[in-house]
A protein has these predicted regions:
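Terminal RNA-binding accessory module
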Residues: 209-297
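Canonical Radical SAM [4Fe-4S] cluster-binding loop centered on the CxxxCxxC motif
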Residues: 1-25
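Active-site proximal loops enriched in glycine and acidic residues that flank catalytic Cys/His/Asp
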Residues: 11-14, 30, 45-47, 79-81, ...
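Conserved, mostly hydrophobic/aromatic
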Residues: 2, 26, 105, 153, ...
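Radical SAM enzyme [4Fe-4S]-AdoMet core and its adjacent flexible, acidic
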Residues: 53-58, 64, 175-242
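Short acidic/His/Gly/Ser-rich catalytic and metal-binding motifs that mark active-site loops
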Residues: 5-9, 113, 196-200
């Protein structure tokens, strides 16, 4: 469930009342997997990690502290509602979790008309404030080469009240974030799916159809002019990314990722042995991936 429970397109309000698992149950489950050899975990599938047990920093620390003592390779969280971001809870995530962690923000739109008509859970100004807080506290680079904790943004197109100006407004806010040198780990761009029981079900695909011709133009502009420049700030040339797990070959090239919630795709111009970790130095950038050279095998 979700403590907000009002966004027009979301199915969370259709579920039962908001419930939280007890820390002990979560600890026992993680320990059981740990004893079987697992060292990588994500505390996911919740609408907002920061809302745990009534937006309670003490309860969040009781959850994270014992898990961190297991010295895991990876401990990441999931979604965060921007309006619930503060320094205290952010510091707990940075203290107890591992680097490469991402707070997925359901901003959905920076167009205030769309925000109001769809009862979205955050305003543009609130989202920017949350981005600044997480950058301030989580923006230091960790041992594996990635930052400890950064925001990610979800954008949804086709919502009620969307107009031709919506794409421009979204771009302007993203450009402002980029110009202020605030880091976003990733930007998810999707089209809404009206589902039964949601407010968007009654609206249907009216706005999707209305702006269909604009969607790919908006999306591609963000990918080329925001994502690409953001990636160069996120992992500049010379950055060392450690423990990249090589997964697939494409011709004479190898592609891998670090363990994590939203790991970067790293391409290497060599046919490397797969299912093996490598330390990689970043030498170039693609639109949404990076090119590296292996330092150690």
């Amino acid at each position: 469930g979700c403590i907000m429970g009002k966004c027009s397109f979301c199915t969370e309000p259709l579920k039962a009342k908001v419930e939280w698992r007890n820390q002990k149950d979560i600890h026992n489950e993680i320990k059981a997997f740990y004893d079987l050899g697992e060292r990588n975990f994500r505390l996911g599938k919740q609408a907002c990690f920061f809302s745990y047990k009534g937006i309670n920093a003490t309860e969040i620390e009781k959850l994270l502290n014992p898990i961190s003592k297991l010295k895991l390779n990876c401990l990441h969280i999931d979604n965060v509602i921007p309006s619930l971001v503060d320094e205290d809870k952010t510091k707990l995530v940075v203290k107890y979790c591992t680097e490469g962690n991402v707070a997925a923000f359901g901003v959905e739109s920076f167009d205030v008309d769309v925000v109001k008509q769809n009862k979205l859970n955050t305003s543009p100004d609130t989202a920017i404030k949350a981005i600044k807080i997480i950058n301030k506290i989580g923006g230091k680079r960790g041992p594996n080469g990635m930052h400890y904790f950064l925001p990610g943004i979800n954008l949804v197109y086709g919502l009620k009240g969307e107009s031709k100006k919506t794409g421009d407004i979204n771009f302007e806010y993203l450009k402002k974030i980029l110009d202020e040198k605030l880091l976003l780990r990733r930007i998810n761009i999707r089209q809404v799916t009206p589902l039964p029981g949601t407010a968007m079900w009654d609206v249907g695909t009216k706005f999707l159809k209305k702006n269909k011709s604009n969607y790919w133009k908006w999306r591609n502009k963000i990918r080329k002019e925001i994502d690409f420049e953001m990636l160069k700030m996120l992992v500049p040339k010379g950055t060392i990314m450690k423990n990249v797990w090589m997964e697939v070959h494409d011709g004479k090239h190898s592609f891998g990722r670090q363990m994590g919630s939203y790991p970067l795709i790293v391409g290497v111009n060599d046919k490397l042995e797969l299912k093996k970790h490598y330390d990689v130095e970043i030498v170039d950038h693609m639109l949404r991936s990076v090119v590296g050279k292996v330092l150690t095998a």
